[in-house]
Amino acid sequence: MGDAIDLSGDGGVLKKIVRSAKPDAISPSDDLPVVDVHYEGILAEDEKVFDTTREDNLVFSFELGTGSVIRSWDIALKTMKVGEVAKITCKPEYAYGRAGSPPDIPPDATLIFEVELVACRPRKGASVGSVSEERARLEDLKKQREIAAAAKEDDKKKREEAKAAAAARIQAKLDAKKGPGKGKGKGKAK
């Protein structure tokens, strides 16, 4: 899609966007450090695939900045958006270095990863936003529920009062119709 971007400043981590994300897509952040990715890892020297999540269609999840993945991934994933697919070229010092990762990755290997950022989310048990913001939101919801309950109770009371008033009016009309001299044998003069 474009030229490779030098993310490390020394040519050690190059990123080339294969598919752009939607403009409003989210990116990993301090609030959303856990990422889910699909990837395919290739040895640059012989283009042999050494690892992929595509075969079993399971995403690989990890938290950025914890050292749980190679340095190039921490650097590159922070620049991606959900839905983006990028080709990341990693020099050995940003991958597995002199040690490699036997048996699949030899020492001093340059690696190429095609990575799709599938999702980013908060740490388990954490929420986006601060605890005080969450408390304030819950307090506001509680107040809204109390106001709604009071309004409902008020409406119920008004309906009961209206029913009682209507019953009193009907009773008054019935009593008026039964006035003196209109009933059977009551007070009729002969």
Swiss-Prot record:
<feature type="domain" description="PPIase FKBP-type">
    <location>
        <begin position="32"/>
        <end position="121"/>
    </location>
</feature>
<dbReference type="Pfam" id="PF00254">
    <property type="entry name" value="FKBP_C"/>
</dbReference>
<feature type="region of interest" description="Disordered">
    <location>
        <begin position="149"/>
        <end position="190"/>
    </location>
</feature>
<keyword id="KW-0007">Acetylation</keyword>
<dbReference type="InterPro" id="IPR001179">
    <property type="entry name" value="PPIase_FKBP_dom"/>
</dbReference>
<feature type="compositionally biased region" description="Basic residues">
    <location>
        <begin position="179"/>
        <end position="190"/>
    </location>
</feature>
<keyword id="KW-0413">Isomerase</keyword>
<dbReference type="GO" id="GO:0003755">
    <property type="term" value="F:peptidyl-prolyl cis-trans isomerase activity"/>
</dbReference>
<feature type="compositionally biased region" description="Basic and acidic residues">
    <location>
        <begin position="149"/>
        <end position="163"/>
    </location>
</feature>
<keyword id="KW-0697">Rotamase</keyword>
<protein>
    <recommendedName>
        <fullName>Peptidyl-prolyl cis-trans isomerase FKBP20-1</fullName>
        <ecNumber>5.2.1.8</ecNumber>
    </recommendedName>
</protein>
<dbReference type="GO" id="GO:0005829">
    <property type="term" value="C:cytosol"/>
</dbReference>
<dbReference type="InterPro" id="IPR046357">
    <property type="entry name" value="PPIase_dom_sf"/>
</dbReference>
<comment type="function">
    <text>PPIases accelerate the folding of proteins. It catalyzes the cis-trans isomerization of proline imidic peptide bonds in oligopeptides.</text>
</comment>
<dbReference type="InterPro" id="IPR050689">
    <property type="entry name" value="FKBP-type_PPIase"/>
</dbReference>
<comment type="similarity">
    <text>Belongs to the FKBP-type PPIase family.</text>
</comment>
<feature type="modified residue" description="N-acetylglycine">
    <location>
        <position position="2"/>
    </location>
</feature>
